[in-house]
Amino acid sequence: MEVEKEFITDEAKELLSKDKLIQQAYNEVKTSICSPIWPATSKTFTINNTEKNCNGVVPIKELCYTLLEDTYNWYREKPLDILKLEKKKGGPIDVYKEFIENSELKRVGMEFETGNISSAHRSMNKLLLGLKHGEIDLAIILMPIKQLAYYLTDRVTNFEELEPYFELTEGQPFIFIGFNAEAYNSNVPLIPKGSDGMSKRSIKKWKDKVENK
Protein backbone atom coordinates (compact mmCIF):
# COMPACT_ATOMS: atom_id res chain seq x y z
CA MET A 1 0.00 0.00 0.00
CA GLU A 2 1.15 3.57 -0.52
CA VAL A 3 0.18 7.06 0.62
CA GLU A 4 -0.95 9.06 -2.40
CA LYS A 5 -2.77 12.11 -1.00
CA GLU A 6 -2.61 14.14 2.19
CA PHE A 7 -4.26 17.18 3.70
CA ILE A 8 -2.44 18.61 6.71
CA THR A 9 -3.74 21.70 8.48
CA ASP A 10 -1.29 24.49 9.29
CA GLU A 11 -1.57 23.63 12.98
CA ALA A 12 -0.61 20.01 12.29
CA LYS A 13 2.26 21.14 10.04
CA GLU A 14 3.62 23.30 12.85
CA LEU A 15 3.50 20.40 15.30
CA LEU A 16 5.17 18.09 12.79
CA SER A 17 7.97 20.60 12.27
CA LYS A 18 8.96 20.88 15.93
CA ASP A 19 7.41 18.15 18.08
CA LYS A 20 9.22 14.80 18.18
CA LEU A 21 6.27 12.94 19.69
CA ILE A 22 3.89 14.16 16.99
CA GLN A 23 6.46 13.22 14.35
CA GLN A 24 6.64 9.75 15.89
CA ALA A 25 2.85 9.37 15.81
CA TYR A 26 2.69 10.48 12.17
CA ASN A 27 5.46 8.08 11.16
CA GLU A 28 3.85 5.14 12.97
CA VAL A 29 0.53 5.75 11.21
CA LYS A 30 2.14 6.09 7.78
CA THR A 31 4.19 2.95 8.34
CA SER A 32 1.07 1.06 9.37
CA ILE A 33 -0.94 2.00 6.27
CA CYS A 34 1.98 1.20 3.98
CA SER A 35 2.45 -2.22 5.59
CA PRO A 36 -0.50 -4.22 4.10
CA ILE A 37 0.46 -6.51 1.22
CA TRP A 38 -1.80 -8.49 -1.11
CA PRO A 39 -1.73 -11.34 -1.93
CA ALA A 40 -0.20 -12.52 1.34
CA THR A 41 2.79 -14.02 -0.50
CA SER A 42 3.57 -10.73 -2.23
CA LYS A 43 5.90 -7.91 -1.23
CA THR A 44 3.51 -5.19 -2.43
CA PHE A 45 -0.23 -4.48 -2.40
CA THR A 46 -2.01 -5.41 -5.63
CA ILE A 47 -5.80 -5.25 -5.82
CA ASN A 48 -8.12 -7.15 -8.12
CA ASN A 49 -9.79 -4.71 -10.53
CA THR A 50 -12.16 -7.13 -12.25
CA GLU A 51 -15.27 -5.13 -11.42
CA LYS A 52 -16.67 -2.43 -9.15
CA ASN A 53 -17.03 -3.25 -5.43
CA CYS A 54 -15.43 -6.68 -5.77
CA ASN A 55 -13.06 -6.47 -2.78
CA GLY A 56 -13.49 -6.12 0.96
CA VAL A 57 -11.97 -3.27 2.96
CA VAL A 58 -12.11 -4.52 6.57
CA PRO A 59 -9.11 -6.87 6.15
CA ILE A 60 -7.04 -3.89 4.99
CA LYS A 61 -7.97 -1.97 8.13
CA GLU A 62 -7.20 -4.92 10.35
CA LEU A 63 -3.75 -5.41 8.80
CA CYS A 64 -3.03 -1.76 9.55
CA TYR A 65 -4.39 -1.96 13.09
CA THR A 66 -2.48 -5.16 13.85
CA LEU A 67 0.79 -3.33 13.27
CA LEU A 68 -0.32 -0.32 15.31
CA GLU A 69 -1.35 -2.51 18.24
CA ASP A 70 1.32 -5.19 18.22
CA THR A 71 4.35 -3.15 17.17
CA TYR A 72 3.59 0.40 18.30
CA ASN A 73 1.30 -0.21 21.29
CA TRP A 74 -1.77 1.73 20.15
CA TYR A 75 -5.13 0.93 21.74
CA ARG A 76 -8.61 0.45 20.29
CA GLU A 77 -11.92 2.04 21.27
CA LYS A 78 -10.83 5.02 23.38
CA PRO A 79 -13.98 6.85 24.57
CA LEU A 80 -14.09 10.64 24.69
CA ASP A 81 -15.26 12.02 28.02
CA ILE A 82 -17.28 14.71 26.24
CA LEU A 83 -19.33 12.01 24.51
CA LYS A 84 -19.38 9.26 27.13
CA LEU A 85 -19.89 11.33 30.28
CA GLU A 86 -21.51 14.58 29.15
CA LYS A 87 -23.49 13.92 25.98
CA LYS A 88 -23.89 10.19 26.67
CA LYS A 89 -23.95 9.52 22.93
CA GLY A 90 -21.40 8.70 20.26
CA GLY A 91 -18.83 5.95 19.92
CA PRO A 92 -15.16 5.77 20.89
CA ILE A 93 -12.14 6.72 18.81
CA ASP A 94 -10.97 3.84 16.61
CA VAL A 95 -7.35 3.81 17.77
CA TYR A 96 -5.53 5.98 20.29
CA LYS A 97 -2.08 6.33 21.79
CA GLU A 98 -0.44 8.45 24.44
CA PHE A 99 3.11 9.42 23.53
CA ILE A 100 5.19 10.30 26.58
CA GLU A 101 8.74 11.58 26.85
CA ASN A 102 10.04 12.94 30.14
CA SER A 103 7.13 15.08 31.37
CA GLU A 104 5.66 15.73 27.90
CA LEU A 105 2.42 14.02 26.85
CA LYS A 106 0.85 13.97 23.40
CA ARG A 107 -2.44 12.15 22.74
CA VAL A 108 -3.29 11.08 19.20
CA GLY A 109 -6.63 9.76 17.94
CA MET A 110 -7.12 8.10 14.57
CA GLU A 111 -10.03 6.76 12.52
CA PHE A 112 -9.65 4.35 9.59
CA GLU A 113 -12.70 5.08 7.47
CA THR A 114 -14.37 1.98 5.99
CA GLY A 115 -17.95 3.30 5.96
CA ASN A 116 -19.93 5.64 3.73
CA ILE A 117 -19.67 9.44 3.56
CA SER A 118 -22.00 9.86 6.55
CA SER A 119 -19.68 7.66 8.58
CA ALA A 120 -16.71 9.77 7.48
CA HIS A 121 -18.43 12.95 8.66
CA ARG A 122 -19.14 11.35 12.04
CA SER A 123 -15.50 10.35 12.35
CA MET A 124 -14.33 13.84 11.49
CA ASN A 125 -16.76 15.48 13.91
CA LYS A 126 -15.87 13.07 16.70
CA LEU A 127 -12.18 13.87 16.36
CA LEU A 128 -12.93 17.59 16.16
CA LEU A 129 -14.82 17.31 19.46
CA GLY A 130 -11.82 15.58 21.00
CA LEU A 131 -9.54 18.39 19.84
CA LYS A 132 -11.93 21.15 20.89
CA HIS A 133 -12.31 19.75 24.40
CA GLY A 134 -8.61 19.09 24.87
CA GLU A 135 -8.83 15.29 24.94
CA ILE A 136 -6.47 14.72 22.01
CA ASP A 137 -3.59 16.75 20.58
CA LEU A 138 -3.64 15.44 17.00
CA ALA A 139 -6.37 13.86 14.87
CA ILE A 140 -5.81 11.61 11.85
CA ILE A 141 -8.21 10.03 9.36
CA LEU A 142 -7.12 7.28 6.97
CA MET A 143 -9.19 6.59 3.88
CA PRO A 144 -8.80 5.12 0.38
CA ILE A 145 -8.54 7.43 -2.60
CA LYS A 146 -11.33 7.32 -5.18
CA GLN A 147 -9.46 5.07 -7.61
CA LEU A 148 -9.03 2.36 -4.98
CA ALA A 149 -12.46 2.78 -3.36
CA TYR A 150 -14.11 1.93 -6.69
CA TYR A 151 -13.00 -1.68 -6.25
CA LEU A 152 -13.82 -1.91 -2.53
CA THR A 153 -17.06 -2.68 -0.70
CA ASP A 154 -20.12 -0.80 -1.98
CA ARG A 155 -20.48 2.81 -0.78
CA VAL A 156 -17.09 3.00 0.94
CA THR A 157 -16.21 6.67 1.03
CA ASN A 158 -12.96 8.09 -0.30
CA PHE A 159 -10.50 10.94 0.17
CA GLU A 160 -11.88 13.01 -2.70
CA GLU A 161 -15.48 12.68 -1.50
CA LEU A 162 -14.69 14.14 1.93
CA GLU A 163 -12.12 16.63 0.62
CA PRO A 164 -14.57 19.56 0.11
CA TYR A 165 -15.14 19.54 3.89
CA PHE A 166 -11.50 19.43 4.99
CA GLU A 167 -11.53 23.18 5.58
CA LEU A 168 -13.82 22.60 8.57
CA THR A 169 -10.76 21.26 10.39
CA GLU A 170 -8.67 24.39 9.81
CA GLY A 171 -7.57 25.87 13.11
CA GLN A 172 -7.05 22.40 14.57
CA PRO A 173 -4.14 19.91 14.23
CA PHE A 174 -5.74 17.50 11.78
CA ILE A 175 -4.33 15.17 9.10
CA PHE A 176 -6.17 13.31 6.33
CA ILE A 177 -4.27 10.52 4.57
CA GLY A 178 -5.45 8.98 1.29
CA PHE A 179 -3.95 5.60 0.45
CA ASN A 180 -3.85 3.60 -2.78
CA ALA A 181 -2.85 0.15 -3.99
CA GLU A 182 0.58 -0.12 -5.53
CA ALA A 183 -0.82 -2.05 -8.50
CA TYR A 184 -4.10 -3.19 -10.09
CA ASN A 185 -4.41 -6.67 -11.60
CA SER A 186 -7.48 -8.77 -12.44
CA ASN A 187 -5.58 -12.00 -11.81
CA VAL A 188 -4.87 -11.60 -8.08
CA PRO A 189 -7.32 -13.07 -5.53
CA LEU A 190 -10.19 -10.94 -4.30
CA ILE A 191 -9.88 -9.48 -0.80
CA PRO A 192 -12.57 -11.13 1.37
CA LYS A 193 -15.47 -8.95 2.45
CA GLY A 194 -16.27 -8.38 6.10
CA SER A 195 -14.23 -10.61 8.40
CA ASP A 196 -14.30 -13.60 6.03
CA GLY A 197 -10.99 -15.41 5.88
CA MET A 198 -9.50 -13.43 8.76
CA SER A 199 -7.99 -15.20 11.73
CA LYS A 200 -9.52 -14.18 15.03
CA ARG A 201 -7.28 -12.19 17.35
CA SER A 202 -7.59 -10.36 20.62
CA ILE A 203 -7.58 -6.60 20.09
CA LYS A 204 -6.00 -4.19 22.57
CA LYS A 205 -8.85 -2.17 24.01
CA TRP A 206 -8.32 1.03 25.96
CA LYS A 207 -10.73 -0.09 28.69
CA ASP A 208 -8.54 -3.14 29.37
CA LYS A 209 -5.49 -0.91 29.78
CA VAL A 210 -7.37 1.32 32.24
CA GLU A 211 -8.88 -1.57 34.19
CA ASN A 212 -5.54 -3.35 34.50
CA LYS A 213 -3.70 -0.39 35.99
Swiss-Prot record:
The active site is at residue 113. The keyword Hydrolase applies. The keyword Hydrolase applies. It catalyses: Endonucleolytic cleavage of DNA to give specific double-stranded fragments with terminal 5'-phosphates. It comes from the Bacteria. InterPro entries: BamHI/BglII/BstY, Restrct_endonuc-II-like, Restrct_endonuc_II_BamHI. Mg(2+) 1 binds at residues 94, 111-112. Homodimer. This is Type II restriction enzyme BamHI. It comes from Bacillus amyloliquefaciens.
